[in-house]
């Protein structure tokens, strides 16, 4: 009996030691609008470029990932209030705010923006002059300072939609009058996921208006210094071994 008690006690102490040694990383995911960077799933088998990178960073480590999925504006509001300790998501200096305060040492991806129109009554885009008296379709929650002057002076109209399906539907129904502006990677991914005929849409570079820029992992401004150093070292390893590029190519 004494031996059984000793074994049970040892097991309990071992479990307690494991729990004490593990630390939680609170990973914030944008619901619905961030594919292919973050793709949420009801069964919590989350994936996506950023999500897979985060998983790879902490794979085999003492850190556990706790997922938090919110609509974009709600997520930003929570993070501005402090969020959960040692939170992580993705961001860029170009975005400002909480997604730009504390970033990884190296970027994880370079963003390009594109303008999508219907091939039915399409038009060439060379400058914003080509958008005079037309409508630019944007997703809710995503703001582009470069476009604000054109919206403010009334030369271009702004139309917000809730998701990619709605955006593609608008430009299909109003060919020649509308264009959807979004990250090139998101456009290609969502056209494919929705099994739309890519020949029905024209994708043109929008880099002359929104210059290309890098995105990074974004951290809690108060993140534990050891955790942040660990992440940065793992990112360097993922890059040097080609794993980072492999993850990106799985989606794009």
Listing of model-derived features with the role each one plays in the protein:
Residues 22-99, 160-161:
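Extracytoplasmic small-molecule ligand-binding "clamshell" domains
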Residues 51-61, 214-249:
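Extended ligand-binding regions for polar small-molecule ligands
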Residues 14-17:
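N-terminal signal peptide c-region/cleavage motif recognized by signal peptidases
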Residues 32-34, 42-44, 93-94, 118-122, ...:
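Short coil/turn segments
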Residues 31-33, 110-113, 196-232, 252:
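Periplasmic-binding protein-like
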Residues 68-130, 141-144, 205-209:
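Acidic, polar ligand-binding/catalytic clefts
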Residues 59, 73-86, 102-103, 164-188:
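Short helices/loops that flank or line small-molecule/ion binding pockets
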Residues 54-62, 106, 130-132, 140-164, ...:
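Ligand-binding cleft/hinge of the Venus flytrap
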């Amino acid at each position: 009996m004494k031996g059984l008690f000793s074994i049970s006690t040892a097991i309990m102490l071992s479990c307690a030691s494991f729990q004490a040694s593990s630390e939680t990383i609170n990973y914030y995911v944008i619901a619905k609008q961030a594919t292919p960077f973050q793709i949420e799933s009801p069964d919590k088998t989350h994936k996506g470029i950023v999500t897979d990178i985060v998983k790879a960073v902490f794979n085999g480590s003492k850190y556990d990932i706790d997922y938090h999925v919110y609509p974009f504006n709600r997520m930003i509001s929570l993070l501005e209030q402090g969020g959960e300790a040692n939170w992580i998501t993705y961001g860029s200096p170009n975005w400002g705010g909480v997604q730009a305060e504390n970033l990884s040492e190296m970027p994880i991806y370079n963003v390009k923006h594109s303008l999508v129109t219907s091939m039915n009554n399409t038009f060439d885009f060379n400058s914003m002059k080509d958008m005079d008296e037309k409508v630019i379709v944007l997703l809710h929650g995503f703001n582009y300072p470069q476009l604000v002057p054109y919206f403010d002076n009334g030369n271009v109209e702004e139309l917000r939609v809730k998701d990619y399906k709605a955006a593609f539907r608008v430009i299909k129904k109003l060919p020649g009058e509308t264009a959807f502006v979004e990250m090139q990677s998101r456009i290609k991914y969502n056209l494919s996921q929705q099994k739309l005929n890519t020949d029905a849409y024209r994708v043109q570079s929008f880099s002359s208006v929104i210059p290309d820029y890098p995105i990074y992992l974004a951290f809690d401004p108060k993140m534990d210094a050891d955790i942040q150093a660990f992440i940065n070292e793992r990112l360097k390893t993922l890059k040097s071994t080609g794993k980072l590029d492999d993850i990106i190519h799985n989606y794009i």
